[in-house]
Design a protein with these regions (language model features):
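N-terminal catalytic cores of peptidoglycan-degrading enzymes
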Residues: 1-108
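Basic/polar, cationic surfaces and motifs that engage anionic cell-wall
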Residues: 2-11, 108, 113, 122-187
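Conserved, mostly hydrophobic/aromatic
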Residues: 35, 117, 135
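Residues immediately flanking
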Residues: 37-38, 119, 158
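Generic alpha-helix detector with strongest preference for long hydrophobic helices that associate
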Residues: 59, 67, 98, 116, ...
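Conserved beta-strand segments that form the floor/walls of ligand-binding pockets within enzyme
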Residues: 79, 116-118
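Metal-dependent polysaccharide deacetylase catalytic core of the NodB/CE4 family, i.e.
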Residues: 103, 119-123
Length: 187
C-alpha cells in the first residue's frame, strides 16, 4: 500500500471523489491522523449511503435520519468498511471536512493539518479485525509519505472535539491498533 505523492491518492483505495474539500494552508505540515466512526443510517452497515453522503448525493427520502443531515457538506480522506474495503474521497494534500470545530495540542482547525479516516461502525459495537488490519496498513503508508505523522499522532475524533464527538467510541480497541502498528521506527 503506497501513497502517490503527486496525486495524493492511496493505490489500494477505491476512488470516490468528493466535492467537500478545499486547499490546506500552504505552510502547515500534515502531522495528525484522526480516526472517526460512521454508519448510515445510524447502526446500519453496508450499502451506498456513506459514499452518497460524502458526495452530496444522499437521498433525503430514503431514511428519516437522512432528512436531519440533508445539506451537510462533509467528507473524510478515507473510509474503511467493515470488510476492510478502502475508499478514498479526498486527496491527502487537500483539506477534507471531517473534524469540524476541533483542537489538538493547543492548535485549532485540525482539518488544516490532519488526515481523516472513517471506520464504518458505531461507538458501542466492536470493530472488525479487517478494519484494524487495514487501518494499520494505512497508517504505515501515510507515515511513510508524511514523516511528521508519528505513532503517537493517531487520535480519535473524541480527542479533538471532546464533549461534541465521541467516535470512534469505547468499542474501538486502541491497544489492538498499537500492537498492529508495532514499535515506533527509529529515526
Amino acid at each position: 500500500m503506497n501513497v502517490d505523492a503527486a496525486s495524493g491518492r492511496l493505490d489500494a483505495a477505491r476512488q470516490v471523489p468528493s466535492p467537500n474539500w478545499d486547499a490546506r494552508p500552504g505552510d502547515v505540515p500534515i502531522d495528525l491522523i484522526i480516526v472517526h466512526g460512521i454508519s448510515l443510517p445510524p447502526g446500519v452497515f453496508g450499502g451506498p449511503w456513506i459514499d452518497a453522503f460524502f458526495t452530496n448525493a444522499l437521498d433525503a427520502g430514503a431514511h428519516p435520519y437522512f432528512r436531519e443531515i440533508k445539506g451537510l457538506r462533509v467528507s473524510a480522506h478515507l473510509l474503511v468498511r467493515r470488510d476492510g474495503e478502502l475508499v478514498q474521497y479526498v486527496p491527502f494534500h487537500g483539506r477534507a471536512w471531517h473534524a469540524g470545530e476541533s483542537r489538538y495540542e493547543g492548535r485549532s482547525r485540525c482539518n488544516d493539518f490532519s488526515i481523516g479516516v472513517e471506520l464504518e461502525g458505531v461507538d458501542d459495537v466492536a470493530y472488525e479485525e479487517a478494519q484494524y488490519r487495514v487501518l494499520a496498513e494505512v497508517i504505515h503508508a501515510l507515515a511513510a509519505a508524511y514523516p511528521a505523522i508519528a505513532p503517537d499522532r493517531v487520535v480519535g475524533h473524541c480527542d479533538v472535539a471532546p464533549g461534541r464527538k465521541s467516535d470512534p467510541g469505547p468499542a474501538f480497541d486502541w491497544a489492538r491498533l498499537r500492537r498492529l502498528l508495532g514499535p515506533p521506527l527509529a529515526t
